[in-house]
Structure formats: structure tokens, C-alpha cells
Amino acid sequence: MEFIQFLQGELLLTGTLFALIILLIVNLYSEKYRKYQVVDTNGAVSLMDDDELIIIDVREEKERKAGFLSNDLNIPMGQVKAKMDTLDKSKNILVYCKSGTRSDRIADILSKNDFQKVSSLKGGFNAWAKADLPIKR
């Protein structure tokens, strides 16, 4: 009874706690049922052993001035759905952006459209550059 009274008296704390629990559940659920892989820079380098790997940069053209990965395709996020039909669904695909947020969204879209081997670069181009891996300008 005292616990319920405490929760009623501390509505901000209760609401925050409830929101955190919901976010935790959503995060655990999304990771378990995600159809694509999230790879770090080492995982991305390993994927590059595949000569047929398709690397997709979903950043806008102006963002590429900071550099880009060798042999990538620049398909800005807003154009991916329109250009999906030009990609081979059977090949490994590595998607990256600046920080990993947009690439996760695009990797999810690709995997839901029957692309079988999709990976998103965790930390995006920022992580790649921070790891001092080769970039093109």
C-alpha cells in the first residue's frame, strides 16, 4: 500500500521509470527480431573480403566531402526505395551513413524487402574514420 502511495506521489519519477521499462523492452525486442546484422569496423573489413560486396553510402552528396569508403555506391537515404530494384538481393550488402542511425533504418528496409545478407556499419563513417581505416576523398 505504501508503495502505491509513493508512486502516486512521485508521478514524474513513476512516468520516467515506466518509459525506461518500455524503451528497454522495445530495444530487446527489436534486436532479437532484426533481420540484418550490425557490424563494427572489424566486421566491415571482414565483409570486404567478398569481392562482390555491395557497399552503400546513404549520406547526402555534401556529406561525402568528409570522405567515403572505396568502391561504394552513393544512394542517399531518400532514394533507396526507388533504387532497390537495381541491387542484387543475393549479394552481401554493407550500408553506412555518418553515425549508423540512417544505415540501420535502410538495412531494416532492405531486409524486409527480401535482401538476405544485409549489414549496417555500427558508428557509420565516423567510426570508420576514427579507426583510421582507408577513406577516399
Placement of each model-derived feature along the sequence:
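Short, surface-exposed ligand- or partner-binding patches at beta-edge/loop junctions that are enriched
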Residues: Y96
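The conserved Walker
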Residues: S99
